[in-house]
């Protein structure tokens, strides 16, 4: 099933490009390994396209990433950081540190890790020429009406929506987790 979804994704991604595109599929059951493999692929010119966490036929619970590159494209190179935790306070702290270092949100998923249980995984990207810093705000609540109110408050403060998951966090149980960001500086 997952392979069918990935192949469908690849065909959709491939249909909107100008010229040939090369894809790299990465799959592992450790987020630390995934970050290392993503950065190795990035050094070869690949860029993050999408992710999903779940049970695969061959590997059990895995996080699966799709990366792509256009052959011969000498464009920007990227660095990647994966954040994975069940604690919203830890995620907020790690997002803040990464944002200050110029990392930009590119995706998130839920992943059942062997060691951490059900975690929110956030993928961040920084180009080799990044000169912008970001501030991130993580909102987590079990009530969708509260989330709507908090999103509007953050929007009035200049935060833009990045992504959302429904997750089981360490303190709040099942929560809607939203991530927002705003630009805070340029060199």
Enumerate the predicted regions with their spans:
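Terminus-proximal functional modules
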Residues: 6, 12-187
């Amino acid at each position: 099933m997952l392979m069918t979804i990935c192949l469908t994704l690849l065909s959709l991604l491939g249909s909107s490009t100008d010229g040939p595109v090369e894809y790299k599929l990465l799959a592992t059951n450790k987020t630390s390994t995934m970050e290392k493999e993503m950065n190795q692929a990035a050094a070869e010119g690949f860029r993050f396209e999408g992710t999903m966490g779940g049970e695969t036929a061959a590997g059990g619970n895995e996080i699966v990433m799709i990366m792509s590159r256009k052959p011969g494209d000498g464009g920007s190179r990227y660095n990647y950081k994966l954040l994975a935790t069940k604690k919203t306070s830890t995620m907020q702290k790690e997002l803040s540190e990464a944002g200050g270092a110029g990392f930009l949100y590119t995706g998130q998923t839920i992943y059942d890790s062997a060691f951490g249980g059900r975690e929110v995984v956030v993928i961040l990207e920084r180009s080799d020429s990044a000169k912008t810093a970001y501030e991130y705000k993580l909102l987590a609540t079990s009530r969708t009406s509260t989330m709507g109110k908090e999103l509007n408050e953050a929007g009035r403060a200049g935060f833009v929506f990045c992504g959302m998951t429904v997750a089981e966090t360490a303190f709040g149980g099942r929560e809607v987790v939203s991530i927002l960001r705003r630009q805070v500086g340029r060199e």
